[in-house]
A protein has these predicted regions:
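Class I SAM-dependent methyltransferase SAM-binding "motif I" and its flanking Rossmann-like core
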Residues: 155-201
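Mature N-terminal, pre-catalytic/accessory segment of carbohydrate-active enzymes
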Residues: 19-24, 47-70, 76, 85-88
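Catalytic beta-strand/loop cores that center a nucleophilic Ser/Cys/Thr
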Residues: 185-258
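Short catalytic/ligand-binding loop motif for oxyanion handling, primarily in non-cytosolic enzymes
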Residues: 123, 153-156, 161-163, 234-236, ...
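Helical hinge/lid and interdomain linker segments adjacent to catalytic or ligand-binding clefts
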Residues: 76-160
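Extracellular ligand-binding/catalytic regions of CAZymes and related secreted enzymes
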Residues: 39, 44, 48, 53-55, ...
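N-terminal Sec-pathway targeting helices
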Residues: 1-14
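Hydrophobic single-pass membrane-insertion segments
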Residues: 22-35
């Protein structure tokens, strides 16, 4: 009798264990059927079709415009190297244009943005024979960008060391005056917070100065002042509409870096160059063209 009770007790225990195992297996099967594995760490382990979600950073907007880079008489070779590097670094397509092409070529077919670099504005004046061709380009919807000498060239009056000279391009009906800082100075620049893309930059930056103009004597209602020199509070960078096009003029050089101790200009984006700001300025320029 005792042995029979013992056997019946063992059978009862085994039945209870079997029933519990059945319940657990039923729960697991139910979760699997509903797509919920019991162990989250096992999710996707044996299912090659399920891939983890990768969040990629948003790419910056591409400046999808062709630049015409003036490389003719008067252009500063060092500045040309810097701008070629800048354009290549930002995957911006460009063509090189000499004084003959800029005078007689169909610029609107060649490029969307025409850049005149630093150098010698008097050489631009004397060796570009047809200044009206540039005006036609901008009036027809092109963008003109002038750095330093290129900015002087665009002004109706160029003032150098107190002496005034009339210039014929006259995109800007005002005066470009300089120099007002020592060549090779790191100029303190105050950015205008009302310019939309400046929300991504501090209010004050520094740009290298190599004799460029400040801009005076103009109708301020028609001109966007992007930046001012901290030293005299005069306009350092301006932009405005011209016909169906747009003009950007810069006194300082955001495209260049400089090592004063070596008197060495940097052309690779180092040494205090502000390539990020310059790229944003070009994007803003083309986006603000008249409709």
């Amino acid at each position: 009798m005792f042995r029979l009770r013992r056997i019946l007790g063992i059978i009862l225990v085994l039945a209870i264990i079997a029933a519990g195992t059945f319940v657990v297996l039923d729960v697991l099967n139910s979760e699997a059927a509903n797509g919920k594995p019991a162990d989250p760490s096992e999710q996707n382990k044996d299912d090659p079709t399920e891939e983890p979600v990768i969040v990629k950073p948003e790419k910056p907007e591409i400046l999808d415009h062709t630049v015409g880079l003036y490389t003719g008489r008067g252009s500063w070779d060092v500045d040309l190297v810097a701008l070629r590097n800048f354009l290549a670094d930002h995957d911006i397509e460009y063509v090189e244009i000499d004084q003959e092409t800029i005078s007689s070529g169909d610029l609107n077919q060649l490029c969307d943005i025409l850049i005149l670099v630093g150098g010698f504005s008097a050489e631009y004046l004397n060796h570009i024979e047809n200044h009206a061709n540039i005006r036609t380009f901008v009036e027809s919807g092109g963008c003109f960008v002038g750095f330093c000498a290129g900015a002087y060239y665009a002004c109706s009056t160029m003032r150098w060391e107190g002496n005034a000279y009339d210039y014929p391009l006259e995109l800007f009906t005002g005066e470009g005056a300089g120099p007002h800082l020592k060549w090779g100075s790191l100029a303190a620049i105050n950015l205008n917070p009302e310019i939309s893309f400046h929300s991504d930059f501090p209010d004050a930056v520094e740009m290298w100065y190599f004799g460029g103009p400040c801009f005076t004597g103009y109708d301020k209602s028609n001109v966007d002042i992007l930046a001012r020199y901290n030293a005299n509070d005069e306009a350092a960078v301006i932009a405005f509409n011209y016909g169906r096009g747009r003009v950007l003029l810069l006194g300082p050089h955001p495209e260049l870096g400089y090592i004063p101790s070596k008197e060495q200009v940097q052309t690779d984006g180092s040494g205090g160059a502000l390539w990020t700001w310059l790229y944003a300025a070009l994007q803003w320029l083309v986006s603000e063209k008249p409709v």
